[in-house]
């Protein structure tokens, strides 16, 4: 009887990170239906963006894969929100779609501690000794101490093209027919969610001269550092819907399975279909769309923002109402997919089932959307599964430490009634958990977890020692009656501007270190206030709410007032864990408690 410490089911972004992380501890089996699909980007050919790049930087700092794969296959990089503060600046990397999957397969298939097992998981059984048996559809029984289930959109998956449906997990791939049953048998309540993907259009049928070109940033950036020169680059482009697009959709809503009532699953609020945009935002006369190449020498482009479940013949008409797409030929049609998800409040903060110990879940199965959210969960689940299999202590990544901590905390304590997407607005202390300091924050955590080796920890520590040296150097240099750091704190001046005034930094500082110096000096006051607020909130969360009349606190949102009155939490910490109670509501509670103390 062959066994492993961990079996990972599914080779998407969550499964990749889970297998990679678990393999740092012991031998792992990666069970996939078709190894050729491992690491595929089934939706947009890009990584990062607001709220998402921060997760990728954190995964990278924890020893994960996604940032490295994205950098290795990048064809276009842009820093989004570059004109805003560092708390919301977010890297977005456009990737060569096929190359990304090929690179992922090279890394995973070449790993000495990861065994690729081909087959379909048909059942999950507890072995009576704290371990698990994965039963395949051809009758094999695979034994492991822990299992990570990362089934994506495949569990009882159904794709929709207009009113026609097919049993698929995604286009052309069969669903997971059996895995929902053992979860339900074990007491899990499953929900149905829905997502969608846009059409892919033949690149040679698009008039790119009629589109707005979006060039890459002049200086390429990456998740793993400053990348070297690329073999090839490509711009992206922008177009938009027209009144003709909107009219055609309105006239044919009866052919949408969502509006006809065929689809039961809840769709993503922050990534709506083009039908939803036209119906829910009818006051807009156009919606921006982004045209993204699948690669430099690609034969097709991806129409970001145009996901749809309308029938193919209508998609042909709709796409040709867009500027630059009048002669467009669709190579692969858009579709919606409906699938099972677990209730994430039935998981621990390490994504282990509270009902089925030793079973971990990650990715879209947990009700999230997006590659980045999936990768982050996969790393957590794979690490926790491996540590459990070896009898090691649990380690929890706290909400205050990272975007990853917020993601876990939201899933477990708040849950979601729709596909969850990470955004900067979900993070209370985002000035402290920026993408630029992810390595400083997360590398020590990765080292403590066993994911990062001593050499990497020392490298990061030495990097930030150089950063501190640079900051100290600026504080000692005077120009025109002021220190260099005082000049740098002026909002209109950059570090380069201050250097033209005569300031110098140690020559050994690299680009990322210079950026860290600039951010820490320029935003020193804001950062200090945020740190003070975080310390105050940590103390405040221990405050008692016993006897508080929540119904009488008018500053609370209606939802928070109703839930607090019904659930009667005894501490601020407990109140903050209730779904629908937001950071603003907690602040209102703290103001109320302070007023009570003053009044008494």
Curated annotation (Swiss-Prot):
Q: Among its keywords, does the record have tRNA processing?
A: yes
Identify which cofactors the protein needs according to its UniProt entry: FAD
Q: What is this protein called?
A: tRNA uridine 5-carboxymethylaminomethyl modification enzyme MnmG
Superkingdom in the source lineage:
Bacteria
| Lineage of producing organism | Bacteria, Thermotogati, Deinococcota, Deinococci, Deinococcales
What keywords were assigned to this record?
A: Cytoplasm, FAD, Flavoprotein, NAD, tRNA processing
GO process terms (BP): tRNA methylation; tRNA wobble uridine modification
Where are the residues of the annotated region Disordered?
216-239
Cite the SMART domains for this sequence: GIDA_assoc_3
Name the InterPro entries on file: FAD/NAD-bd_sf, GIDA_C_N, MnmG, MnmG-rel, MnmG-rel_CS, MnmG_C, MnmG_C_subdom, MnmG_C_subdom_sf
For this chain, the family text in UniProt reads:
Belongs to the MnmG family.
Principal cellular location given in the protein's record: cytoplasm
GO molecular function of the protein, one example? flavin adenine dinucleotide binding
Q: How does it assemble?
A: Homodimer. Heterotetramer of two MnmE and two MnmG subunits.
Q: Name one GO cellular component term.
A: cytosol
Per UniProt, subcellular location reads as: Cytoplasm
Q: Which organism is it from?
A: Deinococcus radiodurans (strain ATCC 13939 / DSM 20539 / JCM 16871 / CCUG 27074 / LMG 4051 / NBRC 15346 / NCIMB 9279 / VKM B-1422 / R1)
